[in-house]
Amino acid sequence: MLKRFPELGRNEQRGSKPRCHLLTDGTRAEVAGRLTGLVKPFGSVSKGYVWRPRGFERTDELQLHIQNRVIPLKVSRELQRWWFAVRGGASPNWDIVSQCSVGKGTDSKDGVLLVEAKAHSAELNSDAKSPAGASDGSQRNHKRIGDAIDEANVGLQRLTGNAGWSLSRDHCYQISNRFAWAWKIAELGVPVVLVYLGFLDASEMSDKGDTFADPEGWGRCVKAHAKGQVPEDVWEQPLQTSSGVSLIARAVAVRQALRAARMPA
């Protein structure tokens, strides 16, 4: 059977995955405009910036502990030391990552846009991190990851003066690691805009979970999912970290239709 998107796997032909590639497909000015829509009013994305994926040309999802062109190398190396006791593990995969400017005018700083995308409610899972393997390295990394998330949780509590943070390796691991990484990157001096992106009207995913009809419904869904881990009043609020740069968490919704079948070249 002909795949609609031959660059993607057979199980990646619908939902949020192809939409992320479609969102980053087009001229550099077009893509920069779309990504700016995820960041504004807190910042912008220029056409000269680096982002991944890059349409269907670069379909890889970045792990930020590995050297990349989006954040400084020294930050990637520090993230690796923070998250792993032993090299060789995998860190969170980001659906979209882009350089961005955070702030306005002369006060703007080079930052990073981190996107976690969803097309239906069942993608917002509350699972714990998978158990560690039998090897000593796996066990040590499992513990280190728990320690890193605990460190981020304490840091966010201090930062906001809100004891309502409850990030954990052992519950709601996905949203916990997303906020932990956003916090750590900002603590390392890189402003962060963390976007939970809801793709509206993904009707082809209705067999998997409830789809999202409007931005308000998506926002309610994200905040309900995050409740108990992330205080509701931190969304859309720039948080000033100890490094002097901002961390901003957002829930944003867009309509991105699946285009007609892409034919192989």
Predicted segments, located by residue:
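Conserved catalytic cores of phosphodiester-cleaving nucleases, focusing on short active-site segments
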Residues: 96-98, 111-119, 178
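Short loop/turn segments at strand-loop or loop-helix junctions that form parts
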Residues: 115-121, 196-201
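Short catalytic/ligand-binding loop motif for oxyanion handling, primarily in non-cytosolic enzymes
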Residues: 105-106, 121-126, 187, 202-206
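Active-site metal-binding core of divalent-cation-utilizing nuclease and nuclease-like domains
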Residues: 61-108
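Extracellular structured ligand-interaction cores
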Residues: 91-95, 110-114, 170-172
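Charged, often low-complexity linker/regulatory segments
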Residues: 1-50
